Curated annotation (Swiss-Prot):
Top-level taxon of origin: Eukaryota
Residues that coordinate or bind substrate: 8-15, 21-22, 60, 87-90, 98, 114-115, 183-184
Protein's name in the database: Phosphoglycerate mutase
Originating organism: Candida albicans (strain SC5314 / ATCC MYA-2876)
Gene expressing this chain: GPM1
Enzyme class: isomerase
Family in the record: Belongs to the phosphoglycerate mutase family. BPG-dependent PGAM subfamily.
Length: 248
């Protein structure tokens, strides 16, 4: 039975500062490193032996995977990386404080940019310090597809080919697959797996550093509801994600 484990990277330095991050390559905070270690401990406690790891091209996801697999005594696992697992590109919001953005633009526009399915934020200037145009991480990617902004719908469009071409093959070969990625790339994948509507996906928040397990059939459809390896911590973490950007 194919098994898929999803883990959102631990708290990053910009999560800690409440900044829109997107494709900006920031590292894990000390808290995030502890979360990643706990993720690995949970994998070990659950007896989950990973066969292959898929990550994005962003350091916070790579760090999370490395720390987690180290804690699980599975650092030897083969790794595949793809820009298609990157976080959603937040356009001109990248590097902006979430609370200040909320105050400047109002609740309605803030929520549309942050959580609507198909409305992207304003595009980033290609010459902006937080643009990824010309970034050597993406030297093998057609420059025409390196985004200047994205909605969740656009994330799904660029993620699903990787799911179909790479991840699905590993699962159908009987491998236990770990994906270490980001809040929105994982929301996109969960939407696909659980057939969540465009409207309902706005309410889905994925906590940092807690493995989410899917058991799948031969058609890669869930055989039962997915489950977190620490449900109580996952509920608290999801609530914290939902509250991001609100005034303190």
């Amino acid at each position: 039975m194919p098994k898929l484990v999803l883990v959102r990277h631990g708290q990053s330095e910009w999560n800690e500062k409440n900044l829109f991050t997107g494709w900006v390559d920031v590292r894990l905070s000390e808290t995030g490193q502890k979360e990643a270690k706990r993720a690995g401990e949970l994998l070990k406690e659950a007896g989950i032996n990973v066969d292959v790891l898929h990550t994005s091209k962003l350091s916070r996801a790579i760090q999370t995977a490395n720390i987690a697999l180290d804690a699980a005594d599975q650092l030897y696992v083969p790794v595949k990386r793809s820009w298609r697992l990157n976080e959603r590109h937040y356009g001109a919001l990248q590097g902006k404080d979430k609370a200040q953005t909320l105050e400047a633009y109002g609740q309605e526009k803030f929520q549309i940019w942050r959580r609507s399915f198909d409305v992207p934020p304003p595009k980033i200037d290609p010459k902006d310090e937080y643009s990824q145009v010309g970034d050597r991480r993406y030297a093998d990617v057609d420059p025409a597809v390196v985004p200047l902004t994205e909605s969740l719908a656009l994330v799904i469009d660029r993620l699903l080919p990787y799911w179909q071409d790479e991840i699905a093959g590993d699962l159908l070969a009987g491998k236990v697959v770990l994906i270490a990625a980001h809040g929105n790339s994982l929301r996109a994948l969960v939407k696909h797996l659980d057939n969540i509507s465009d409207e309902d996906i706005a309410g889905l928040n994925i906590p940092t550093g807690i493995p989410l397990v899917y058991e799948l059939d031969e058609n890669l459809k869930p055989t039962k509801p997915s489950y977190y390896l620490d449900p109580e911590a996952a509920a608290a973490g999801a609530a914290a994600v939902a509250a991001q950007g609100q005034k303190k």
